[in-house]
């Protein structure tokens, strides 16, 4: 039988709170007036929503129109967003519902930002450290509130370079953490999925977000986007194993008594030092970043540092 693990920190946050804090199945969404908002132009489209730039009077806002999904999923996202308040987390301003279509829309603050793909190459070492600190600050906070984001990736971050400000967006896959609860492994985007998801381990915790953050940091440090580039979920694990090694993967699976690995993973090789991916001439500059990555990008979710532990790493000692 598979070994059930529990988060090393913040494991019982929700158990200590009133059930109304986390029970989205019983949550009733209070909505505002849809007439206050006007759609201006489309900004993007996702699997579960369409996003528009809008206006409230003369104020710019973001309108996230949700596609028809289970009501509980909408309630979960709204309840989580209403529970969170942090400078590095996008602010939910209102929720409205179309009286005819019954489609829900979430109203967010508007952040002036550049597309990540455009600024990816331009970010210098100090930028990388500062934005990493802000991501970890947001994760430390939401984890302390008993919430896992479950979809950390560059596309779910907006960066205002002029103000050196980052905010984490899209909390549609976020979930309340309860120890020993089985969760869906069909979360996170492929390139940022933790190994625990790829071996179908359902008892994951906040450390999933830390792995995903590590993938983002690796992209920025090594200028390799994405860092683990799988063509499918099974190939994603192959790409991870080619860097972290087959032996350590096998030990991880055996330790938690997971289903045996497919024999195809046997020939992927052994662990490669992450420092070997450092761009020429940057080795000394990125020593601390690589040291942190070596601690984060590991198979065993129980051994990854927490967001708080990451923030105490030497990488963030000087800003």
From Swiss-Prot:
ATP binds at residues 43-51, 64. Keywords: ATP-binding, Kinase, Nucleotide-binding, Serine/threonine-protein kinase, Transferase. GO terms for molecular function: ATP binding; protein serine kinase activity; protein serine/threonine kinase activity. It is an enzyme of class 2 (transferase). Its EC number is 2.7.11.1. GO terms for biological process: regulation of cell cycle. It comes from the Eukaryota. SMART domains: S_TKc. GO terms for cellular component: cytosol; nucleus; protein kinase CK2 complex. It catalyses: L-seryl-[protein] + ATP = O-phospho-L-seryl-[protein] + ADP + H(+); L-threonyl-[protein] + ATP = O-phospho-L-threonyl-[protein] + ADP + H(+). InterPro entries: CK2_alpha, Kinase-like_dom_sf, Prot_kinase_dom, Ser/Thr_kinase_AS. The active site is at residue 151. Belongs to the protein kinase superfamily. Ser/Thr protein kinase family. CK2 subfamily. Catalytic subunit of a constitutively active serine/threonine-protein kinase complex that phosphorylates a large number of substrates containing acidic residues C-terminal to the phosphorylated serine or threonine. Tetramer composed of two alpha chains, one beta chain and one beta' chain. This is Probable casein kinase II subunit alpha homolog.
